[in-house]
């Protein structure tokens, strides 16, 4: 038998409350991101479905590049839009202009308003925005789970190094199947 076979509704209530304070955060899966996202999009969509089923908040982070000299992630362009293959199941879409998602005042206000303190992270780029966001979340004392098979990078060779980095900063690195079986 499994642990869930022995849970009563009373026993499950604390789990439900914990999940209300948790969020799946999908970072920068936008048209201008590395095409490597196509290798993870199915798992990201599975993670989104799992989050909805488990009553987690589903949050999307978009990067807007305001630098004059660059052409990617420009506000109002197709490149800045979320990738069309991704399931968008909420209106909780926040924009950032720096690599750390916590620099978005609207995002941090939303987290505070809803008491969100635990995160499951998916998206890109593992060596940039995910790295900065995870570091800063862990530094603030949040619980951070990086879904290792739901992240990618422009340079996929850096993924093992990034996973070790996340762990060294106090983040849990897990595969999607490890959390969806709970």
What residue ranges belong to the model's regions?
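Conserved protein kinase catalytic core
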Residues: 34, 68, 155
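Flexible, glycine- and charge-enriched loops at secondary-structure boundaries
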Residues: 37, 41
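Short, small-residue-biased leader/transition segments that mark boundaries at the very start
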Residues: 1-13
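Short, conserved beta-strand edge motifs with alternating hydrophobic and charged residues
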Residues: 25-27, 59-62, 94-95
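Short acidic, Gly/Ser-rich segments with clustered Asp/Glu that frequently serve as metal-coordination loops
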Residues: 30-36
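Active-site-adjacent betaalpha module
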Residues: 16-23, 42, 46-54, 71-182
